Curated annotation (Swiss-Prot):
The keyword ATP-binding does not apply. It catalyses: Hydrolysis of proteins to small peptides in the presence of ATP and magnesium. alpha-casein is the usual test substrate. In the absence of ATP, only oligopeptides shorter than five residues are hydrolyzed (such as succinyl-Leu-Tyr-|-NHMec, and Leu-Tyr-Leu-|-Tyr-Trp, in which cleavage of the -Tyr-|-Leu- and -Tyr-|-Trp bonds also occurs). It comes from Mesostigma viride. Its main location: plastid. This is ATP-dependent Clp protease proteolytic subunit. Its EC number is 3.4.21.92. Keywords: Chloroplast, Hydrolase, Plastid, Protease, Serine protease. Component of the chloroplastic Clp protease core complex. The gene is clpP. It holds the Pfam family CLP_protease. The active site is at S101, H126.
Amino acid sequence: MPIGIPKVAYRIPGEAVSTYVDVYNRLYRERILFLGEDLDDEVANQLIGVMVFLNSEDDTKGIFFYINSPGGSMNAGLGVYDMIQHVNVDVTTICMGLAASMASFILAGGTPGQRLMFPHARVMLHQPMGGNGGKAKYMVEESVEVKRLRELIAHLYVKRTGQSLEKIRKDMNRDNFMRPRQAKEYGLIDHMVTNVNELDELDKQSNDLKKLGKVNLTNIETSNKSELK
């Protein structure tokens, strides 16, 4: 018998009394997202909507995106991937369990240096799925578009991993499972983590690098102004 989604107490900023919301809504407020099912348009739109909201609410705090999914449609995956690139904040992607097909693509699309896996997680690379069939004429047209999208995804894997296009194409032709060490060597992830404290430390390092970048930029601007005087 299913237990349903648990409710947890949450006090909305500015309110005196806490209210009970489902645990996922509570986590969203903490800037934590989950992809824990097949990726379709509905799931993708929910994730995209939350990312847009969190980015507009505060563009200085990062988002943690946990992934345990067998993948799904290419269009849905590309939508989530593009939104990760679009938002101003860092998006830390974390694989727990399995990130397969388009889910591995989203994992690789996280902020460089912040693409993570737990020790016993796996990623799986293969050809992402296309459409569902129909009349012959439309199936031919769709087949051409599916091939185009697969080629686009292969090129994006090249960009995110540093592997050659030929190797990516070859590895996508079959189910290609990787453990954390293999995924890191391949370029799909940056680190393996074992506990939440490591996530906090990586987040702190990222913020420190951003501050350093701002300081360096300020110094450059000040130097340029001095030279112009």
